[in-house]
Regions:
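Short coil turns that delineate tetratricopeptide repeat
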Residues: 31, 64-65
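Terminal, low-structured helical/coil segments at or just beyond the last alpha-helical repeat
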Residues: 70-90
Length: 90
C-alpha cells in the first residue's frame, strides 16, 4: 500500500528506510509528483539533509502552489534564517 497517508505515517514514525523504499517504487499514477516531492522533502528533513529537503519542497510548490510543502518550506526557511543570520549579511 503506497498511499500518501501510509508513507507519511512511516516518516512520522521514523521508519525512514521503509518510507524511502515505498517512495522509490511509487509511480505518478499512484501518487502525484507534487505529493511525492513533499514526502521526499519530509524524509530528507527527518534526516537533517536540509538542502535536499528544500529542493523537494520547492519542486512540490512549483507543481502545486497549494501543496502543504509551501508552509513547511516557509518554516524551514525561517528556522534557517534565525540560526544562520550571518548568511543574510554578506
Amino acid at each position: 500500500m503506497k498511499t500518501f497517508k501510509h508513507i507519511l505515517k512511516l516518516i512520522e514514525e521514523q521508519d525512514l528506510i521503509m518510507a524511502e523504499l515505498q517512495l522509490t517504487s511509487v509511480g505518478e499514477v499512484e501518487l502525484p509528483a507534487a505529493e511525492q516531492h513533499y514526502l521526499w522533502g519530509l524524509l530528507f528533513a527527518k534526516r537533517s539533509d536540509w538542502k535536499q529537503a528544500q529542493t523537494h519542497f520547492l519542486h512540490a510548490v512549483a507543481l502545486d502552489p497549494q501543496s502543504p510543502a509551501r508552509e513547511t518550506l516557509e518554516m524551514l526557511t525561517n528556522i534557517y534564517d534565525y540560526h544562520y543570520k550571518d548568511n543574510l549579511n554578506p
